[in-house]
UniProtKB/Swiss-Prot annotation:
Gene3D superfamilies recorded: 3.30.230.10, GHMP kinase, C-terminal domain
Described purpose of this protein according to its UniProt entry: Catalyzes the phosphorylation of the position 2 hydroxy group of 4-diphosphocytidyl-2C-methyl-D-erythritol.
Gene Ontology MF, one: 4-(cytidine 5'-diphospho)-2-C-methyl-D-erythritol kinase activity
Protein name, entry field: 4-diphosphocytidyl-2-C-methyl-D-erythritol kinase
Binding-site residues, ATP: 97-107
Active site residues of this protein: 11, 139
Leader sequence residues: none
Keywords: ATP-binding, Isoprene biosynthesis, Kinase, Nucleotide-binding, Transferase
NCBIfam families: ispE, PRK14608.1
Keyword Hydrolase: no
Record lineage: Bacteria, Pseudomonadati, Pseudomonadota, Alphaproteobacteria, Hyphomicrobiales
Reaction catalyzed: 4-CDP-2-C-methyl-D-erythritol + ATP = 4-CDP-2-C-methyl-D-erythritol 2-phosphate + ADP + H(+)
Leading EC class: transferase
Keyword ATP-binding appears in the UniProt entry: yes
Length: 291
């Protein structure tokens, strides 16, 4: 069979409400409206007998040891659940920053599962595919079919596709990797403790851009404040985006350090990206659309 290819887009938390810390397992219970960007890693699979991975691209260096890569971890989980699973050699081209709050590794893992599902004629809702996604990481299930939807719990509750209008946006990462654990530690919730705050607004399917902004503007990312104590440069990135013409909303994604801003139109987003690149030439800056 010939080479298979798919994209692994950045996952953006348009909202991220932390409801509390669950008494049973200690995980943080979340509600998040998730969208996906046009900017992405690329994953290829050359079918063959042995499982292998090669990583290249501008952010390949920080991606860590190959044996621990989520692409291989996801493939191994699926192979454990499907007898005789056909495998092969993966080639991952890394464009997305690592430890950045945009689910790059999770999206890569989900891309691997999509390619293996295609190779083995498995549906994405096949129990073994879902189980492999959950076993690989909390954000992997929502990345299997990368379209806007609600995510709840510790990532295991995935809502239906919302078919939201594309949002012109700019993604900015100030080049500081941020691990999730220190951010949740800074949030400081004890097991069983709930976090005060307004409930997440309801999100209807098929909203246009103005309606999406109307939903997410009064919402929040509850990890933004603790992340600022871990990496204060996040605040600089947010301020720089908010100063750009046409910026309608700027917020951190995930546990950081990537931030995003939604703009009035594509031209404004392109202009803002150019201005941020001039102001901070060492930062990762990408104009894109979120949907």
């Amino acid at each position: 069979m010939s080479l298979l290819t798919t994209r692994a887009p950045a996952k953006i938390n348009l909202t991220l409400h932390v409801l509390g810390r669950r008494p049973g397992d200690g995980y943080h219970a979340l509600e998040s409206l998730v969208a996906f960007a046009e900017v992405a890693d690329t994953l290829e699979l050359l079918p063959g007998r042995d499982l292998a991975l090669e990583v290249s691209g501008p952010t390949a260096g920080p991606a860590g040891p190959l044996d621990d890569n989520l692409v291989l971890r996801a493939a191994r989980h699926l192979a454990a659940g499907v007898d005789g699973l056909r495998l092969g050699a993966f080639r991952l081209h890394k464009q997305l920053p690592v430890a950045a709050g945009i689910g790059g590794g999770s999206s890569d893992a989900a891309a691997a599962l999509r390619l293996l599902a295609e190779l083995n004629a498995l549906a994405l809702d096949h129990p073994a595919v879902i189980a492999a996604a959950r076993a690989t990481g909390a954000d992997v299930p929502v990345c299997l079919d990368p379209r806007a939807r609600m995510m709840r719990g510790a990532g295991e509750e995935i809502g239906p596709v919302l078919e939201l209008a594309p949002l012109p946006a700019v993604l900015v990462n100030p080049g500081v990797p941020v691990s999730t654990a220190p951010v949740f530690k800074a949030l400081g919730l004890a097991v069983g403790q709930r976090l005060d705050g307004a409930e997440h607004p309801g999100v209807a399917a098929g909203l246009d851009a103005d309606a999406v902004l109307g939903v997410i503007a009064p919402a929040r990312n509850d990890l933004e404040a603790p992340a600022l104590t871990v990496a204060p440069v996040i605040g600089e990135a947010l301020a720089l985006l908010r100063a750009q013409g046409g910026c309608r909303l700027a917020r951190m994604s995930g546990s950081g350090a990537t931030v995003f801003a939604i703009f009035s139109d594509t031209a404004a987003a392109q202009a803002a990206a150019g201005a941020v690149r001039v102001a901070q030439p060492g930062w990762w800056v990408e104009p894109t659309r979120l949907a």
